Protein backbone atom coordinates (compact mmCIF):
# COMPACT_ATOMS: atom_id res chain seq x y z
CA UNK A 1 0.00 0.00 0.00
CA UNK A 2 1.05 3.60 -0.43
CA UNK A 3 2.58 5.28 2.63
CA UNK A 4 3.93 8.33 0.81
CA UNK A 5 1.64 10.81 2.56
CA UNK A 6 2.60 9.64 6.04
CA UNK A 7 6.28 9.63 5.05
CA UNK A 8 6.30 13.40 4.56
CA UNK A 9 7.21 14.77 7.99
CA UNK A 10 8.88 17.94 6.73
CA UNK A 11 12.20 17.18 8.41
CA UNK A 12 13.41 14.06 6.56
CA UNK A 13 12.98 12.07 9.75
CA UNK A 14 11.08 9.25 8.02
CA UNK A 15 13.67 8.49 5.37
CA UNK A 16 13.44 4.85 6.44
CA UNK A 17 10.04 4.56 4.75
CA UNK A 18 11.56 5.68 1.46
CA UNK A 19 14.52 3.35 2.00
CA UNK A 20 12.08 0.48 2.56
CA UNK A 21 10.17 1.13 -0.65
CA UNK A 22 13.39 1.46 -2.65
CA UNK A 23 14.58 -1.88 -1.26
CA UNK A 24 11.48 -3.50 -2.76
CA UNK A 25 13.23 -3.08 -6.11
CA UNK A 26 15.15 -6.21 -5.09
CA UNK A 27 12.95 -8.10 -2.62
CA UNK A 28 9.45 -7.97 -3.99
CA UNK A 29 10.01 -6.80 -7.54
CA UNK A 30 13.18 -8.61 -8.62
CA UNK A 31 12.54 -11.70 -6.47
CA UNK A 32 8.89 -12.21 -5.52
CA UNK A 33 7.21 -14.38 -2.90
CA UNK A 34 5.13 -17.11 -4.53
CA UNK A 35 2.26 -17.12 -2.01
CA UNK A 36 1.02 -15.02 0.90
CA UNK A 37 2.52 -17.45 3.41
CA UNK A 38 5.90 -16.51 1.93
CA UNK A 39 5.34 -12.78 2.54
CA UNK A 40 8.41 -12.59 4.78
CA UNK A 41 10.56 -13.11 1.66
CA UNK A 42 9.16 -9.81 0.51
CA UNK A 43 8.71 -7.69 3.63
CA UNK A 44 11.21 -9.31 5.98
CA UNK A 45 14.05 -9.20 3.48
CA UNK A 46 13.09 -5.65 2.52
CA UNK A 47 13.11 -4.55 6.16
CA UNK A 48 16.61 -5.98 6.54
CA UNK A 49 17.80 -4.15 3.41
CA UNK A 50 16.16 -0.98 4.69
CA UNK A 51 18.24 -1.18 7.87
CA UNK A 52 21.41 -1.68 5.86
CA UNK A 53 20.62 1.37 3.74
CA UNK A 54 19.85 3.45 6.84
CA UNK A 55 23.22 2.50 8.26
CA UNK A 56 24.81 4.17 5.24
CA UNK A 57 22.58 7.26 5.36
CA UNK A 58 22.92 7.78 9.12
CA UNK A 59 25.00 5.47 11.32
CA UNK A 60 24.82 2.25 13.30
CA UNK A 61 23.37 4.02 16.37
CA UNK A 62 20.32 5.17 14.41
CA UNK A 63 19.81 1.69 12.98
CA UNK A 64 20.08 0.18 16.46
CA UNK A 65 17.26 2.49 17.56
CA UNK A 66 15.04 1.33 14.71
CA UNK A 67 15.86 -2.31 15.38
CA UNK A 68 14.83 -1.95 19.02
CA UNK A 69 11.48 -0.44 18.02
CA UNK A 70 11.00 -3.20 15.45
CA UNK A 71 11.74 -5.83 18.11
CA UNK A 72 9.31 -4.24 20.56
CA UNK A 73 6.57 -4.16 17.93
CA UNK A 74 7.27 -7.82 17.17
CA UNK A 75 6.87 -8.76 20.84
CA UNK A 76 3.63 -6.78 20.90
CA UNK A 77 2.40 -8.81 17.92
CA UNK A 78 3.10 -12.02 19.81
CA UNK A 79 0.66 -10.85 22.50
CA UNK A 80 -2.24 -10.65 20.05
CA UNK A 81 -1.53 -12.96 17.09
CA UNK A 82 -2.49 -16.66 17.44
CA UNK A 83 0.42 -19.06 17.85
CA UNK A 84 -0.08 -20.72 14.47
CA UNK A 85 0.16 -17.31 12.78
CA UNK A 86 3.45 -16.42 14.49
CA UNK A 87 5.48 -18.63 12.17
CA UNK A 88 7.46 -16.89 9.45
CA UNK A 89 5.82 -19.27 6.99
CA UNK A 90 2.44 -20.09 8.54
CA UNK A 91 0.02 -22.62 7.11
CA UNK A 92 -2.64 -20.65 5.24
CA UNK A 93 -5.31 -23.02 4.04
CA UNK A 94 -7.31 -20.20 2.48
CA UNK A 95 -4.36 -18.56 0.76
CA UNK A 96 -5.87 -15.24 1.82
CA UNK A 97 -3.55 -12.29 2.48
CA UNK A 98 -5.68 -11.35 5.50
CA UNK A 99 -4.54 -14.56 7.20
CA UNK A 100 -1.02 -13.11 7.46
CA UNK A 101 -1.77 -11.26 10.67
CA UNK A 102 0.04 -8.29 12.17
CA UNK A 103 3.52 -7.25 11.08
CA UNK A 104 5.35 -10.40 12.13
CA UNK A 105 6.55 -11.11 8.58
CA UNK A 106 8.26 -7.71 8.58
CA UNK A 107 9.95 -7.77 11.97
CA UNK A 108 10.60 -11.47 12.50
CA UNK A 109 11.85 -11.76 8.93
CA UNK A 110 14.27 -8.87 9.44
CA UNK A 111 15.47 -10.33 12.73
CA UNK A 112 16.03 -13.72 11.09
CA UNK A 113 18.31 -12.20 8.46
CA UNK A 114 20.13 -10.26 11.17
CA UNK A 115 20.58 -13.57 12.98
CA UNK A 116 22.21 -15.02 9.86
CA UNK A 117 24.43 -11.96 9.41
CA UNK A 118 25.53 -12.15 13.04
CA UNK A 119 26.36 -15.82 12.71
CA UNK A 120 28.18 -15.89 9.38
CA UNK A 121 29.56 -12.36 9.30
CA UNK A 122 28.52 -9.54 7.02
CA UNK A 123 30.97 -10.29 4.22
CA UNK A 124 29.93 -13.92 3.87
CA UNK A 125 26.24 -13.13 4.23
CA UNK A 126 26.42 -10.33 1.66
CA UNK A 127 27.98 -12.71 -0.84
CA UNK A 128 25.09 -15.10 -0.25
CA UNK A 129 22.52 -12.32 -0.73
CA UNK A 130 24.11 -11.13 -3.97
CA UNK A 131 23.93 -14.68 -5.29
CA UNK A 132 20.34 -15.06 -4.12
CA UNK A 133 19.12 -12.00 -6.00
CA UNK A 134 21.08 -12.97 -9.09
CA UNK A 135 19.94 -16.60 -9.17
CA UNK A 136 16.25 -15.86 -8.54
CA UNK A 137 15.95 -12.63 -10.53
CA UNK A 138 12.49 -12.23 -12.10
CA UNK A 139 11.23 -15.40 -10.43
CA UNK A 140 8.74 -16.25 -7.71
CA UNK A 141 9.88 -18.53 -4.90
CA UNK A 142 8.47 -20.26 -1.85
CA UNK A 143 9.94 -20.45 1.63
CA UNK A 144 11.00 -24.04 1.00
CA UNK A 145 12.88 -23.09 -2.18
CA UNK A 146 14.67 -20.40 -0.18
CA UNK A 147 15.54 -22.85 2.60
CA UNK A 148 17.07 -25.32 0.15
CA UNK A 149 19.06 -22.51 -1.45
CA UNK A 150 20.15 -21.26 1.98
CA UNK A 151 21.31 -24.72 2.95
CA UNK A 152 23.30 -25.23 -0.25
CA UNK A 153 24.70 -21.70 -0.46
CA UNK A 154 25.36 -20.72 3.14
CA UNK A 155 24.80 -23.39 5.78
CA UNK A 156 26.67 -26.32 4.22
CA UNK A 157 29.70 -24.31 2.99
CA UNK A 158 30.08 -22.88 6.51
CA UNK A 159 29.38 -25.83 8.83
CA UNK A 160 28.89 -25.63 12.56
CA UNK A 161 27.38 -22.14 12.65
CA UNK A 162 23.66 -22.47 11.92
CA UNK A 163 21.85 -25.73 11.17
CA UNK A 164 18.83 -26.40 8.98
CA UNK A 165 16.90 -27.30 12.13
CA UNK A 166 17.70 -23.92 13.68
CA UNK A 167 16.49 -22.15 10.55
CA UNK A 168 13.28 -24.18 10.47
CA UNK A 169 12.57 -23.15 14.06
CA UNK A 170 12.26 -19.58 12.75
CA UNK A 171 9.99 -20.69 9.93
CA UNK A 172 7.66 -23.14 11.62
CA UNK A 173 7.54 -22.26 15.32
CA UNK A 174 5.74 -19.44 17.17
CA UNK A 175 7.58 -16.69 18.99
CA UNK A 176 11.35 -16.50 18.70
CA UNK A 177 14.08 -19.14 19.07
CA UNK A 178 16.13 -18.96 22.27
CA UNK A 179 19.20 -17.81 20.34
CA UNK A 180 17.44 -14.96 18.52
CA UNK A 181 19.31 -11.64 18.72
CA UNK A 182 17.96 -9.01 21.12
CA UNK A 183 18.62 -5.50 19.75
CA UNK A 184 19.79 -2.79 22.13
CA UNK A 185 20.35 0.96 21.93
CA UNK A 186 22.04 3.19 24.46
CA UNK A 187 20.13 6.24 23.22
CA UNK A 188 16.77 4.52 23.57
CA UNK A 189 17.72 3.28 27.01
CA UNK A 190 18.48 6.89 27.93
CA UNK A 191 15.05 7.95 26.62
CA UNK A 192 13.39 5.24 28.72
CA UNK A 193 15.32 6.41 31.77
CA UNK A 194 14.17 9.97 31.12
CA UNK A 195 10.56 8.79 30.86
CA UNK A 196 10.83 7.05 34.22
CA UNK A 197 12.50 10.05 35.84
CA UNK A 198 9.88 12.48 34.53
CA UNK A 199 6.98 10.22 35.49
CA UNK A 200 8.30 9.97 39.06
CA UNK A 201 8.90 13.71 39.34
CA UNK A 202 12.69 13.47 39.41
CA UNK A 203 13.09 15.71 36.36
CA UNK A 204 11.12 18.29 34.38
CA UNK A 205 10.21 18.18 30.70
CA UNK A 206 12.32 21.28 30.02
CA UNK A 207 15.38 19.40 31.26
CA UNK A 208 14.99 16.54 28.79
CA UNK A 209 17.38 17.07 25.81
CA UNK A 210 14.88 16.35 23.05
CA UNK A 211 16.71 18.67 20.65
CA UNK A 212 19.33 15.95 20.22
CA UNK A 213 16.81 13.11 19.92
CA UNK A 214 15.76 11.19 16.85
CA UNK A 215 12.05 10.46 16.29
CA UNK A 216 12.80 6.92 17.48
CA UNK A 217 13.90 8.26 20.88
CA UNK A 218 10.68 10.26 21.22
CA UNK A 219 8.65 7.18 20.32
CA UNK A 220 10.52 5.09 22.89
CA UNK A 221 9.98 7.77 25.54
CA UNK A 222 6.22 7.68 24.92
CA UNK A 223 6.13 3.88 24.93
CA UNK A 224 8.12 3.79 28.18
CA UNK A 225 5.66 5.90 30.18
CA UNK A 226 4.23 3.91 33.11
CA UNK A 227 0.65 2.69 32.91
CA UNK A 228 -0.37 4.58 36.05
CA UNK A 229 0.74 8.00 34.79
CA UNK A 230 -1.96 10.58 35.51
CA UNK A 231 -4.00 12.20 32.76
CA UNK A 232 -2.78 15.58 34.00
CA UNK A 233 0.84 14.64 33.31
CA UNK A 234 -0.05 13.22 29.92
CA UNK A 235 -1.82 16.45 29.01
CA UNK A 236 1.23 18.38 30.19
CA UNK A 237 3.39 16.27 27.90
CA UNK A 238 1.06 16.86 24.96
CA UNK A 239 1.03 20.61 25.56
CA UNK A 240 4.82 20.80 25.86
CA UNK A 241 5.73 18.59 22.90
CA UNK A 242 2.73 19.17 20.63
CA UNK A 243 2.16 15.46 20.21
CA UNK A 244 -1.45 15.75 19.06
CA UNK A 245 -0.43 18.13 16.28
CA UNK A 246 2.92 16.66 15.25
CA UNK A 247 3.61 16.28 11.55
CA UNK A 248 5.59 13.10 12.16
CA UNK A 249 3.18 10.26 11.44
CA UNK A 250 5.13 7.66 13.42
CA UNK A 251 5.26 9.80 16.57
CA UNK A 252 1.58 10.64 16.09
CA UNK A 253 0.69 6.96 15.73
CA UNK A 254 2.56 6.12 18.92
CA UNK A 255 0.94 8.98 20.83
CA UNK A 256 -2.59 8.27 19.64
CA UNK A 257 -2.27 4.62 20.65
CA UNK A 258 -1.61 5.97 24.13
CA UNK A 259 -4.58 8.34 23.75
CA UNK A 260 -6.87 5.42 22.91
CA UNK A 261 -5.52 3.03 25.53
CA UNK A 262 -5.49 5.60 28.33
CA UNK A 263 -8.80 7.28 27.38
CA UNK A 264 -7.28 10.76 27.00
CA UNK A 265 -10.55 12.29 25.84
CA UNK A 266 -9.18 15.79 25.29
CA UNK A 267 -7.06 14.39 22.45
CA UNK A 268 -9.87 12.44 20.76
CA UNK A 269 -10.57 15.13 18.14
CA UNK A 270 -6.93 15.35 16.95
CA UNK A 271 -6.89 11.55 16.87
CA UNK A 272 -9.95 11.52 14.60
CA UNK A 273 -8.21 13.97 12.27
CA UNK A 274 -5.11 11.78 12.23
CA UNK A 275 -7.12 8.65 11.41
CA UNK A 276 -8.94 10.43 8.58
CA UNK A 277 -5.81 11.67 6.81
Predicted segment positions?
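Long, ordered, helix-rich scaffold segments
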Residues: 102-108, 125, 136-142, 154-277
